[in-house]
């Protein structure tokens, strides 16, 4: 009987011994806190992956939807997205917003020109200036300077989306290209 109990005890001990070591895993949590009278970066302007051809072409990211359209023989695949910034003022506060009109994306080959940079608005901020901006009063066009907007949310937090046109050169060298877009907000 004692031998039977010893075997039974070993049977219960075996599963505990079969457990492997505890392996930790971690995740990153991130939050952006928007302070009053500021503007902060949220996401980059992305044109996806581009296959160049012997002729030039363009990839346009919409400031309203973040979707891409292509002209010319080049091929674009992958995710496109508009750049996004967030800011905080107060409800009905005016803000003059200006941004880069042209930028160069540099990398291993000839620079690519980013132009027709446009600011798209949404339900958090409304255009309150020149009705001819971007043809319909919802954005800035190349050469526009410090257009006036009104913050319309009760919290004063607003979001700005930025799109533009990337001019891809004929036979553009492969690699990663980057450049900068600067946005300036003057609260009034």
Model-derived features: where do they sit?
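Contiguous segments within soluble domain cores/interaction surfaces
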Residues: 90-138
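N-terminal small/polar-rich segments of proteins
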Residues: 17-108, 146-188
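Bacterial N-terminal signal peptides that target proteins for export
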Residues: 1-3
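Acidic, glycine-rich flexible loop segments
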Residues: 120-166
